[in-house]
Amino acid sequence: MTLSAGGMVTSEYAKRYPIFTIEGGPISGIIGGIRLSSILGGKNIIVIDGGSTTTKAGLAKELTPKVYTEYWIEQDDWNAGYPLRVPTLDITEIGLGGTSLVWIDDAGNLRVGPQAAGARPGPACYGQGGDKPTLTDAYVLSGFLNPEYLLGGRLKVFKDLAHKAMSGIARQLNLDEKEASYGVVRLANDNAANLIRQISVKRGYDPREFTLIAHGGAGPMFAPFIAEELKIPEIVVPAIPSGVFNSWGMIGLDIRHELSLTDISSLKMDGAYAKYVGSRFEELESRVREMFKLEGVDPSSVVTERYLDIRYEGQAHTLKIPCYNGRLGIEHLKEAAEMFHKAHYKEYGFSLPESGMEIVGFHVVGIHKVKPPELSRISTTGSLNRASLGERTLFVDGSEFNVPIYKKESLPAGVVVEGPCIIEGDTATTVVTKNFKARHDDFGNIILTPNRR
């Protein structure tokens, strides 16, 4: 099972402490994005997982995600959310996905989500009894989704039911169904772009310095519009099928255990205090190694990491600062204090070097390395003509035009296609806008980069 902090534990441990596995699924996707990027030689990544009811995003600068000791469920710009004091990778989410309901609020504004039709009854076009319009219905009506090839043609889609469901929204907006549908698509793209702003710009990161890794059924459809809005220079749509990318991220995760201890004291620069801090870490390290031993892992194979939760005196919030992993001296406490000042400045825009500091807690992470799975290379044989599925009409910004459609599974390695076009896979559809070109790499990933004409 995946921990919210990004490691793996046995099912028995997860049964005893289920709270530590919250958000384990999408966090596996972030880890998968980190692993994929390391294979491709990437550096800074933002991972977006566009699903059925929610879209989640995480960020890893230098392929290292931040871990927070507090996680807020259902927190957004309008809701305070619910806090959980568990170590969690930095991840944020919104109620947006393929089954998000389309509606008009009391002020006459178009809305997409957070309510959703879910798997049952699902979008109206699925013919499972749903009669309310969803984002998927809008994709079908505006031409982005192929009603004949969803799930490789295994899922029948009824375009007439999508028309019927969207008609009420169109009437309220004084538009036809196609115009209303594209309005829904644009709003969904804007909401997804705002999610990426939350995980990047609001954290002090420039999205122009990152690669966007897009997975899930909706992720590759949001991605080019997000990249255009935020000037992200590269998009990677993983070769791993969208429905199992999180699972792929979980396979090969390091086994991980961690413990925290709250013990508030003023940070002092003297030898006795350094010895005291070291003893607290050693206590936690001993307990962490015992946890590995109970799971059949040789404690001598475990690598430990130390962190201090530090704050300025009089403050409520803390920052997690790495600490020297050995016998502590005054110089190591000074180093931690300097790192705290820098981290505080980056996080909040100011630091107080002359102010007193407090250590609020101690945190030890134990890691047993596991070899991750490798990616297989795909065939270089085949041709673009064999992958062609003809053309389809898109409705965008009030205009209709035809774009080429390609079958993802038939594209040979190394082929490059220019946008606008659509690449249809068995489990996901990748939209390539006119400002991008797409390369099918040696592993079967789709790499989108700006199309400089």
Q: Where do the PLM segments sit?
A:
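Conserved P-loop NTPase motor core
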Residues: 61, 68, 86, 102-105
